[in-house]
Amino acid sequence: MSGAGVPDMPALHAEDVTLAIVASTWHETICDALLDGARKVAEQAGVTDPTVVRVLGAIEIPVVAQALARTHDAVIALGVVIRGETPHFDYVCDAVTQGLTRVSLDASTPVANGVLTVNTENQALDRAGLPNSAEDKGAQAAAAALSTALTLRQLASPS
């Protein structure tokens, strides 16, 4: 199981960061939990009203993240892809990962990849931030996005 070596999430002060979250609706219980975790971290960091956009599946996430990256300081991508019996899993995971990376680099905007790519539904549930989950990948993605946005801001305005 994942979770070993996870760093402590820093206390973030991101009150003036504009944040967007794009989350799929496929595997609703898991995606809703990921979204809840991301929203909690955002609120703790002072981001009270992030833009939230829901899409059907993971493959739609990168293009919506691209639109959001044009108008926000950070974007969080949330979803889940569970391996099936065909190569479709590999194609979707690769397309989503490459798409999100490209959006982040092209827009110079952090896009945190909180899209779970797992072999089983139980693995996804264990990472979704539910009461019995070992991890909260939605919360971790939010911390990564906000932390990176603040780092980029510091780099852009040297002391």
UniProtKB/Swiss-Prot annotation:
InterPro entries in the cross-refs: LS (IPR034964), LS/RS (IPR002180), LS/RS_sf (IPR036467)
HAMAP family linked to this entry: Lumazine_synth
Protein name: 6,7-dimethyl-8-ribityllumazine synthase
Pathway: Cofactor biosynthesis; riboflavin biosynthesis; riboflavin from 2-hydroxy-3-oxobutyl phosphate and 5-amino-6-(D-ribitylamino)uracil: step 1/2
Catalytic activities: (2S)-2-hydroxy-3-oxobutyl phosphate + 5-amino-6-(D-ribitylamino)uracil = 6,7-dimethyl-8-(1-D-ribityl)lumazine + phosphate + 2 H2O + H(+)
Gene coding for it: ribH
A molecular function (GO) term: 6,7-dimethyl-8-ribityllumazine synthase activity
Gene3D superfamilies in UniProt: Lumazine/riboflavin synthase
The organism of origin for this protein: Mycolicibacterium gilvum (strain PYR-GCK)
Functional note: Catalyzes the formation of 6,7-dimethyl-8-ribityllumazine by condensation of 5-amino-6-(D-ribitylamino)uracil with 3,4-dihydroxy-2-butanone 4-phosphate. This is the penultimate step in the biosynthesis of riboflavin.
CDD domains: Lumazine_synthase-I
One term under GO cellular component: cytosol
Key word Transferase present: yes
EC number: 2.5.1.78
Keywords, alphabetical: Riboflavin biosynthesis, Transferase
